[in-house]
C-alpha cells in the first residue's frame, strides 16, 4: 500500500489539532463577557479556520486512494491523540492515566485500520 495517503491523513489530523488549539487560544484571549461575534475577529479564530481548510484539502486528496471508512477514523483518532497532548502542553489541561490509556488505545486502533485498509 502507498504510504502517501496515510501521511496526508495524519497531516490533516495535525492541521485539525492546530486549528482547535488556535480556536481555544483565540477564545481564551477574550474577556469572559465577550460575545460570540467577537470571536470571529480574533487571530486565533482566523488561524483556526485556515488550518481547518488545509485539513479538508489534505483529507480530500487522501480520499482519492483510501476508503473513507478507513481514512476518517485515522483522521479523527490521530487528531484526537495530538490534541490531548497539545492541550496539556499549551493550556495545562490535565493528562491523567485514563487519558494516556485512551490515547494508547486510539493509536492501536489507528495502526489496525492503517494496516487493514
Curated annotation (Swiss-Prot):
What cellular-component terms does GO give this entry? Answer: plasma membrane
Q: Which GO terms describe its molecular function?
A: transmembrane transporter activity
The alphabetical list of record keywords is:
Cell membrane, Membrane, Plasmid, Transmembrane, Transmembrane helix
For this protein, the record's Gene3D superfamilies field holds: 1.10.3730.20
Q: Which InterPro entries match?
A: Small_drug/metabolite_transptr, Small_multidrug_res
Keyword Cell membrane in annotation: yes
- Entry's transmembrane regions: 3-23, 40-60, 66-86, 94-114
Q: Does the keyword Membrane apply?
A: yes
Q: Which Pfam families match?
A: Multi_Drug_Res (PF00893)
How is this protein positioned relative to the membrane?
Answer: Multi-pass membrane protein
In which domain of life is the source organism classified? Bacteria
UniProt lists the family membership as follows: To E.coli and S.aureus ethidium bromide resistance proteins (ebr/QacC/EmrE/MvrC).
Name assigned to this protein: Uncharacterized protein y4nH
Q: What is the lineage of its organism?
A: Bacteria, Pseudomonadati, Pseudomonadota, Alphaproteobacteria, Hyphomicrobiales
